[in-house]
Amino acid sequence: MLEFLSQQKPKILIIGDFMVDNYTWCDCSRISPEAPVLVAKTLKEDKRLGGAANVYANLKSLGADVFALGVVGDDKSGKFLQENLKGEFLIQKGRKTPFKNRIMAHNQQVLRLDEEDISAILLENELIALFDEKIKDFKAVVLSDYAKGVLTPKVCKAVIKKAKALNIPVLVDPKGSDFSKYSGATLLTPNKKEALEALKFENLEGENLEKGIKKLKEDFALRYSIITLSEAGIALFDEGLKIAPAKALEVYDVTGAGDSVIAVLAFCLASGIEIFKACELANEAAAVVVSKIGSMSVSFDEIKSFNRVDFEKKIKSKEELLTLLKQNDKKIVFTNGCFDIVHFGHIKYLEKAKRLGDVLIVGLNSDASVKRLKGESRPVNSEFQRACMLAAFYFVDFVVIFDEDTPLELISFLKPDILIKGADYKDKLVVGADIVSKVELIDFEEGFSTSKIIEKIKDKK
């Protein structure tokens, strides 16, 4: 999918609150003699695209042909945006273009100074007319709302109505507790806090998540309903609730993660990618961005690199695994098998298994175990080779080799939450079923098996 997307260049229009993010890097190594405050010595300044402009930067970095429409003031920040973005900006005299100055010391943000005018723009009709003139050439529209006055109810409703009439998807990063102005959009991407405010729910735990995300879809006539859940991933409601689990990376700065998410979703929808796959990719993009400092864009090359982990490190002993699992409160999914010659059926089976929890552990029969179960001619591939093949898949989190004929001892030791087996176990005893909270049976892809592959090879000789 990444190779396909890397070759696309969809035309995407973005409207919203374009801002300037300024970073003042300082040395704060002493206390002022005048008051108990830090003395900040300025080392350098770094001016970046912020708000809707950061969504623009992300889309451009991904390879999209992006066009910006907005309203800025007749000031330095407005001029900076016009010089650095391809698009058209209406100038409202006397209006302050949003400018956020972050004071940074030792890679930590210690203070933020904002200059902005959050009153509703005076050029609504002109902006709508400009949009009507441009829209027909684009594959998707992004509304990036930071509540700075550009995306008024009138502007939002006009944009969504026009785009919908042309069958062009509209993706909205919303702000505030009233989402009614976004009614009819293709999707919204509120975070957990924003969704709670709009729904007036106390929490989104358990059944409340599905109830809430479905309510957003129905109340605001959305094609898809999405809630970003930070470290828990992205929740999607289409015909039913699905969770795209987050990708774990060290978090340095969450600034701009939401911008990267909506940029990837817009790029994917404009390129014809299925919505759940788009959510999975958006998670990977967010994981890359939060590992950086400040508002930063993401590219497909970075996402590819993110997925190229040292897969041998995913092969663990059961003792190592138990230590790692104790450190995280995650839903553990376990499955097992010989996986002698990995084929398409295995891939789809493991991919489905991963979606049922946060961490997927594959218990792998050792060479000695396979030989006892399958005969002297097996395995075809060694346990290390088989473990590396499984660990190379992004949806497999850990591989653990066991020497027994069944995984009972391993399951008893690790105590996973969910045990996965093939649908052929429907009327059979599942080893370890009494230890776990839940057993899930997954259908195999028809026509694929290691034995059939071996027979086919023998027949050709």
Curated annotation (Swiss-Prot):
Entries under CDD domains matching the protein: RfaE_like
Biological pathway: Nucleotide-sugar biosynthesis; ADP-L-glycero-beta-D-manno-heptose biosynthesis; ADP-L-glycero-beta-D-manno-heptose from D-glycero-beta-D-manno-heptose 7-phosphate: step 1/4; Nucleotide-sugar biosynthesis; ADP-L-glycero-beta-D-manno-heptose biosynthesis; ADP-L-glycero-beta-D-manno-heptose from D-glycero-beta-D-manno-heptose 7-phosphate: step 3/4
Annotated ATP binding sites: 191-194
Location of region: Ribokinase: 1-312
A biological process term (GO) from this entry: ADP-L-glycero-beta-D-manno-heptose biosynthetic process
Domain of life per record: Bacteria
Catalytic reactions on record: D-glycero-beta-D-manno-heptose 7-phosphate + ATP = D-glycero-beta-D-manno-heptose 1,7-bisphosphate + ADP + H(+); D-glycero-beta-D-manno-heptose 1-phosphate + ATP + H(+) = ADP-D-glycero-beta-D-manno-heptose + diphosphate
InterPro entries reported for this sequence: Bifunc_HldE (IPR023030), Cyt_trans-like (IPR004821), PfkB_dom (IPR011611), RfaE_dom_I (IPR011913), RfaE_dom_II (IPR011914), Ribokinase-like (IPR029056), Rossmann-like_a/b/a_fold (IPR014729)
UniProt keyword list: ATP-binding, Carbohydrate metabolism, Kinase, Multifunctional enzyme, Nucleotide-binding, Nucleotidyltransferase, Transferase
Region (Cytidylyltransferase): 334-461
EC number(s) stated in the UniProt entry for this protein: 2.7.1.167, 2.7.7.70
Active site: 259
One GO CC annotation: cytosol
A Gene Ontology molecular function term of the record: phosphotransferase activity, alcohol group as acceptor
Enzyme class: transferase
Database matches in PANTHER family: BIFUNCTIONAL PROTEIN HLDE
Subunit structure: Homodimer.
Function: Catalyzes the ADP transfer from ATP to D-glycero-beta-D-manno-heptose 1-phosphate, yielding ADP-D-glycero-beta-D-manno-heptose.
The family this protein is said to belong to: In the N-terminal section; belongs to the carbohydrate kinase PfkB family.
HAMAP family, per the entry: HldE
Protein name: Bifunctional protein HldE
